[in-house]
Amino acid sequence: MLKAADLTGALAEHYVPILKIILVTAFLTQKLHDRYGPVVRISPNHLSFTQPDAWKEIYGFQPSSKGSTEMNKSKIFSETVEELPKSIINADREEHQRLRRALAHGFSDASMREQEGMIIKYIDKLSDRLKEFADDGTSPQNMAGWYNWTTFDVAGDLIFGQSFQCLERADYHPWVAFIFGAIRFGSVMTSVKYIGLNFVVQALFKMGGMKAMSQVRENTDEMMQNRMRMTDDRNDLFEGLLKRRKEWNLSFDQLSANALILVLAGSETTATTLSGTTYLLLTHPEVYEKLKKEVRSAFKDSSEINIGSVSKLSYMLAVLNESLRLYPPVTSGIIREAPEGGCRIGGQHIPEGTLVEIQQWSSNHSPDNWPDPWKFDPERFLESEKTNVNRLDSLQAFSVGPRNCIGRK
């Protein structure tokens, strides 16, 4: 039996709770893995893994006395504040399956093709605005900002039926700007709860967080009310859930909470990936030139570029995968709790109640998984399966199992 106390990495017990608050945990954990190996203890009852097989063992289904089951998310991280409504993020297994079924159609190939014209409209708008602001390439631009403005506009249209107009104003919508602050505040509250000070979390929420969250919810509720008043069948990301509102007795708060989650999940992470990819391409001109050649030889003009045609660009997909590996939008892990009776991870028995996770930053930069892990090398994903020494199955940017990212496609 592998117990957390049996493992090295004890220094992390003292420093990880503090480092969580300043949001550098993933980088510390990666250094611990480099020093101690594929399993390290990052706090008294918390283990981090980097073995590829651990993805399915932690986030997939586990055999148990009650049949096949998934590990529960740790309530420390999934239920930070008691007063907040449930969403697909922290729903129990049955409710999660129900919500996911309702949302699945909006993420299907057919639905994406139907929404393709709208998405391209925003991409064209981004291109036009960059030409306007960049002064023929002589004026530096904050691409992270431009990508976020684009993805939030797209997400707003796909979910609420209205754009946030970020591209139009070349700035964040007040709601979007406030959300970023709320996310940072939420990370701090989670860290405080992690070190056992839940009463402080509740007090902070009641003192200031509740007011802040009420402002977010007020704006979200207003957009949701506008979306519900739309009479046309939009077939967008949220249509499936709205159609089942009465059948499943979904409250307005539940609808609003899930809409907020979808906007965040579909915008900021995409923008982060685009920012990382852009940086890596511009700092590796040989990769950029090869990608440019593939794209320009595949299409006569931009009108031929669509969801179906870009999926055939093997080198472009390799560049995206390598960018997701080196610059993951989610650096830390989703923390699960070993079930009653314990479980097996990496060939070891893990006692029940132990917190376990795979942090993408550590897994993606492990020399056990990736030779020369800090090198930007899209060719990793083009080598034949027989000769490839990279553990491609260790890259799981969208996670695995029943709670993996529904927007993976």
Predicted feature locations:
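Hydrophobic, repeat-rich solenoid/adaptor surfaces of innate immune receptors and signaling proteins
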Residues: Q51, L126, T273-T278, Q360
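Conserved cytochrome P450 K-helix E-x-x-R motif and the immediately C-terminal K′/meander segment
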Residues: P17, I21-T29, E218, E304-G346
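Cytochrome P450 heme-iron axial ligand motif
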Residues: L262-T269, Y279, T387-K409
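Structural signal for hydrophobic/aromatic residues that build the beta-strand cores
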Residues: L32, I42, I123, A155, ...
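Conserved cytochrome P450 K-helix/beta-meander segment immediately N-terminal to the heme-binding cysteine loop
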Residues: E239, I358-K386
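N-terminal membrane-proximal hinge/A-helix region immediately C-terminal to the signal-anchor transmembrane segment
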Residues: M1-R98, I120-K125, R129, T150, ...
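Cytochrome P450 catalytic-core helices
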Residues: T269-E294, R408-K409
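Cytochrome P450 heme-thiolate monooxygenase catalytic core
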Residues: K66-V81, E114-L274, K290
